């Protein structure tokens, strides 16, 4: 039976190291002797229910660890469920009862170290690179045991589309990239090409691939993985030369201006490209060469294949300028830098420089790397370390961190990001903080204090080592990461939300909270946020936006500002200014003023804001309005808030809720769910926008209707139903945040309960 271990310490202190005793670390372990017959039956039922309903509910409810925690804590929901009938008015007691039920359930899900565990996956291209890399390096069986393989296969079978392919994420239609790499993953894991025990998964996948032109229509990142495996030729790839890291700072795009995920990916990938590395051929590799192309492998024109991309994968068609750019880079990289004498004078030096960067970034993040995409696609880092020296400590340190990325759900094993521990904990604490009152019981008090302890121990207390600016790193001291302190790469909104929580605890009496956080650490957090504000008033996520944009560069290439991060930062800094007016008061006020203007300038014609990290316009509007309100704006004095409220009212469905499709993200316009269904996460966010916009004082009916949806959606145990996927990054790649169904629903109920009490 699989079990989740929290704060798992290193079994091998040589290759795994920590900055804070592994606080927040989440590791799944299989124990063949664990679990009673009843517990095992419960797990199997959850798996069976997901598989049977996978065509209707694509995202897992993340049940396995929840069942484990509820058993361990002997949780029993004793408060009866509230049901609001059609003609019935919601009373204050109804709302408070529903909130109380949800808080008791949510409290039981908190880990002993204070954070809330959760899956953070959802994207279908996360598993295969790990499998391919471990296969190439000969460590597949060591890392992925039989039990791991069973769950890997379960995940791929569960998320294969009806047409035989796989999409970019669990709700996505099939594309070439994910279909090819998942097909290869199945074959590496021992599934035969023509038949298997799951309705010929390989045969159906191969048919989809061949029907859509074959693997030469994979995008660049897919072609790179096929090249290192030896089932594609590097000459059919767009160039990723290691000499890129030599570009001076005055170039429009250089190592320092790249978006951090792209930088981490291209570090390892450019080394492999520059080395022209290809895995040792095996019988399976030779078979794959014949299975994923419609023509014989030896007949493929790699030059013609270089610019191919399936229409299903082509989110941003390449412009004429981009065509010229890539052709120029290819000529320079392959016809000049890769030939004598330049290959000795420049290429070898570039390879050494690239690996210096790889090692620096790996060490600075304790081999967790810069984020979900870098570690998953830039398993390239791990592979580059192995190519450099298969016996190196660098490679062994990467292997030691692989368990940090494994997550087990009822739908199988998925490689996730390194975790969303800090983000989930800060947002979860907001629920308890906003619902805080003087008669709080000991259970809620304990939840608050454990969460505070986790945040305090997870703050980044030092900048990266050495001359970090030279290595394309930036100030980190004072920030909070997305996950834990070991990862070491702070994010602005995670910092802002965590700082806001810490300011609440700072305002509490010592009798309630005990020892408080060092005030200097709060100052450090403020400094970090101030550092990230751009001239336009917006705030970036990881590093200042110093990219020099040109026509052919998408915003996925360089760092830029985000409305959600800006809104969160305004909330935290406005509260900080109230509690600590003596620290950088003018700078903080200037930040808020500029941030408000940035938010107002970014508002869409319909009154919404585009959400970069969640689905999508409702998500962005929630964080934008929250920031405006914290800055002193309200419905009466702010046109932007009035327009935002109108957008929310206009998109409310007949049930009284809201449901937004993930398609809003790539299409950049509001798209409701099919059938105008309700999603409780969107509904919670929209409900809070209405309350912040003083809708209760003008016409409370839309608010009551939304609250009724949330209250009636609550399940017998206090949980809320898992529905559509609600996280995203870079418009196309969806991420699964299953705890959102608890956070945003309960947070909304705290707002609603307070609003009822104030009537």
From Swiss-Prot:
Protein name as it appears in the record: Baruol synthase
Catalytic-site annotation from UniProt: 493
Record carries keyword RNA-binding: no
EC number: 5.4.99.57
UniProt function note: Converts oxidosqualene to baruol (90%) and 22 minor products.
Claim: Isomerase is one of the keywords in the record: yes
Chain positions of PFTB repeats: 149-190, 522-564, 641-682
Catalytic reaction equation(s): (S)-2,3-epoxysqualene = baruol
Biological process terms in GO annotation: tetracyclic triterpenoid biosynthetic process
Keyword annotations from UniProtKB, A to Z: Isomerase, Repeat
């Amino acid at each position: 039976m699989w079990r989740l271990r929290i704060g798992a310490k290193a079994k091998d202190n040589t290759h795994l190291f920590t900055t804070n005793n592994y606080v927040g670390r989440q590791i799944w372990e299989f124990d063949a002797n664990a679990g009673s017959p009843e517990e095992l039956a419960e797990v199997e039922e959850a798996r069976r229910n997901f598989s049977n309903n996978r065509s209707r509910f694509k995202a897992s409810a993340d049940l396995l660890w929840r069942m484990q925690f509820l058993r361990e804590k002997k949780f029993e929901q004793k408060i009866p469920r509230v049901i609001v009938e059609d003609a019935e008015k919601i009373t204050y007691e109804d709302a408070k009862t529903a909130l109380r039920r949800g808080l008791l359930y949510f409290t039981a899900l908190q880990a002993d170290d204070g954070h809330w565990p959760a899956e953070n996956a959802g994207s279908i291209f996360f598993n295969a690179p790990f499998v391919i890399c471990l296969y190439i390096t000969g460590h597949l069986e060591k890392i992925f045991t039989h039990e791991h393989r069973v769950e890997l296969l379960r995940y791929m079978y569960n998320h294969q589309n009806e047409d035989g392919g796989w999409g970019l994420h669990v709700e996505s239609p099939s594309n070439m990239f994910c279909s090819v790499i998942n097909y290869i993953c199945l074959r590496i894991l021992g599934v035969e090409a023509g038949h298997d025990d799951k309705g010929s998964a390989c045969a159906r996948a191969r048919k989809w691939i061949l029907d859509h032109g074959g693997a030469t229509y994979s995008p660049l990142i897919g072609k790179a993985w096929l090249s290192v495996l030896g089932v594609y030729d590097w000459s059919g790839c767009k160039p990723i030369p290691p000499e890129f890291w030599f570009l001076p700072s005055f170039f429009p795009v250089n190592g320092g201006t790249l978006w951090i995920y792209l930088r981490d990916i291209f570090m390892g990938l450019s080394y492999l490209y520059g080395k022209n590395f290809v895995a040792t051929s095996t019988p399976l590799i030779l078979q794959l060469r014949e299975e994923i192309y419609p023509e014989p492998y030896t007949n493929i024109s790699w030059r013609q294949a270089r610019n191919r991309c399936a229409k299903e994968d082509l989110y941003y068609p390449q412009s004429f300028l981009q065509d010229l750019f890539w052709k120029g880079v290819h000529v320079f990289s392959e016809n000049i830098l890769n030939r004598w004498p330049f290959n000795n004078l420049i290429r070898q030096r570039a390879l050494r420089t690239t690996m210096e960067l790889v090692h620096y970034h790996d060490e600075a993040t304790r081999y967790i790397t810069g984020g979900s995409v870098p570690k998953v696609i830039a398993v390239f880092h791990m592979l580059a370390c192995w190519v450099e020296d298969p016996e190196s400590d660098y490679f062994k340190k990467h292997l030691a961190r692989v368990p940090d990325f494994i997550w087990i759900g009822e739908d199988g094993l998925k490689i996730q990001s390194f975790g969303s521990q800090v983000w989930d904990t800060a947002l979860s604490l907001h629920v308890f903080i906003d619902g805080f009152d003087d008669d709080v019981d000991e259970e809620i008090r304990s939840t608050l204090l454990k969460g505070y302890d986790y945040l305090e121990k997870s703050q980044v207390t030092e900048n990266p080592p050495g001359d970090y600016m030279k290595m394309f790193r930036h100030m980190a001291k004072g920030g909070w990461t997305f996950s834990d302190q070991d990862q070491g790469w702070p994010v602005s909104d995670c910092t802002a939300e965590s700082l806001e929580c810490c300011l609440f605890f700072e305002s509490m009496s010592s009798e309630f909270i005990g020892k408080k956080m060092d005030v200097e650490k709060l100052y450090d957090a403020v400094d970090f946020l101030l550092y990230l504000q751009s001239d336009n008033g917006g705030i970036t996520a990881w590093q200042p936006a110093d990219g020099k944009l040109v026509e052919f560069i998408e915003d996925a290439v360089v760092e830029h500002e985000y409305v959600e991060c800006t809104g969160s930062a305004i909330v935290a800094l406005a509260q900080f200014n109230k509690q600590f007016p003596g620290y950088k008061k003018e700078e903080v006020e200037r930040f808020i003023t500029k941030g408000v203007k940035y938010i107002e300038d970014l508002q869409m014609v319909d009154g919404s804001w585009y959400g970069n990290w969640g689905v999508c316009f409702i998500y962005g509007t929630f964080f934008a309005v929250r920031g405006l309100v914290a800055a002193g704006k309200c419905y009466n004095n702010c046109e932007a808030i009035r327009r935002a409220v109108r957008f929310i009212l206009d998109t409310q469905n007949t049930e009284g809720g809201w449901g937004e499709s993930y398609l809003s993200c790539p299409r950049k316009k509001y798209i409701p769910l099919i059938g105008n269904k309700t999603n409780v996460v969107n509904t919670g966010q929209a409900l809070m926008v209405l309350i912040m916009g003083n809708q209760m004082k003008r016409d409370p009916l839309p608010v009551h209707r939304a609250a009724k949806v949330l209250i009636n959606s609550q399940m017998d145990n206090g949980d809320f139903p898992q529905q559509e996927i609600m996280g995203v990054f870079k418009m196309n790649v969806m991420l699964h945040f299953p705890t959102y169904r608890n956070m945003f629903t309960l947070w909304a109920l705290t707002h609603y309960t307070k609003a009822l009490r104030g009537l």
